[in-house]
Amino acid sequence: MPDIVNRKVEHVEIAAFENVDGLSSSTFLNDVILVHQGFPGISFSEINTKTKFFRKEISVPIMVTGMTGGRNELGRINKIIAEVTEKFGIPMGVGSQRVAIEKAEARESFAIVRKVAPTIPIIANLGMPQLVKGYGLKEFQDAIQMIEADAIAVHLNPAQEVFQPEGEPEYQIYALEKLRDISKELSVPIIVKESGNGISMETAKLLYSYGIKNFDTSGQGGTNWIAIEMIRDIRRGNWKAESAKNFLDWGVPTAASIMEVRYSVPDSFLVGSGGIRSGLDAAKAIALGADIAGMALPVLKSAIEGKESLEQFFRKIIFELKAAMMLTGSKDVNALKKTSIVILGKLKEWAEYRGINLSTYDKVRKRE
């Protein structure tokens, strides 16, 4: 078995220090315009950003999506993120726990999260390919118990696996049958998330038919995992690197993925993530159809700089979110979901080509 511990460290190193953010891709969020209200009818001080994340109340409609864990230095990053998200009342997801299930010495880098963040929602994480490889209820329960998780994310990453030097692109349909059966035995909800290439309406409908109602778009336009694996291929002299260059813009852009999932599965719980880099991006994602926004890479980079840097990052994000809410007259998160928007450019073209009627969608995104 490849050394997945070292692979996790290399992934974080490349993500944090190489140019892989939004490389050759776009979120399409620039095509989402929040309509300015010159007289908002509210005061900044009364804006309420609280919302629900399954059974728990959270302070802002933003979560940290899973990215890291597996070795001591990664555990230190997880500890910083957990301490700060606990302070701000923000849910936190961890990276894939496969490494901790298969290597006991990696468990503490994940377990530390709940030790320093006793109250916020924590989201466990395993990969869909592991279901094909033999994972079942036992491994899911282990991942959940390891961090006393409030939910578990199951990540889809076929594009990353295809170009990864040691990739395992295994996505047979019986993995969904296993996931459906496992979900019936778990005490916490399952969120199916992508890994930088977005969820299409076809995938959302398929997952929904197997009982999945919670999604995380992780759309194109943020951390480019094909680029990360391309860099790893280059370092190893792997011929896959040349092929990976042709796929750097592969995927469903984040804004399009939010629309596709919300339109095809209207009653879903939806995290809009992938290239969310500001509070304004988060506000756009929520107004477009997400329940909350998610981000990973900018959190990772700030955490590497230290706890104070990450705290300042979240203060900035929350201020920008509240500014967008103020300027749209949205006194709370539900109002933000119903605020007036205009969809332009490539996103409008995408929606129309994919059969999404914009007038109908406006009602769907508002949950009317």
From Swiss-Prot:
GO terms for biological process: isoprenoid biosynthetic process. FMN binds at T65, G66, M67, T68, S96, N125, K193, S218, T223, G275, I276, R277, A296, L297. It is found in: Cytoplasm. One of its GO terms (molecular function) is NADPH binding. One of its GO terms (cellular component) is cytoplasm. Its cofactor is FMN; NADPH; Mg(2+). InterPro entries: Aldolase_TIM, FMN-dep_DH, IPdP_isomerase. Mg(2+) binds at E161. It holds the Pfam family FMN_dh. SUPFAM superfamilies: FMN-linked oxidoreductases (SSF51395). Homooctamer. Dimer of tetramers. Involved in the biosynthesis of isoprenoids. Catalyzes the 1,3-allylic rearrangement of the homoallylic substrate isopentenyl (IPP) to its allylic isomer, dimethylallyl diphosphate (DMAPP). This is Isopentenyl-diphosphate delta-isomerase. It comes from Saccharolobus islandicus (strain L.S.2.15 / Lassen #1) (Sulfolobus islandicus). The gene is fni.
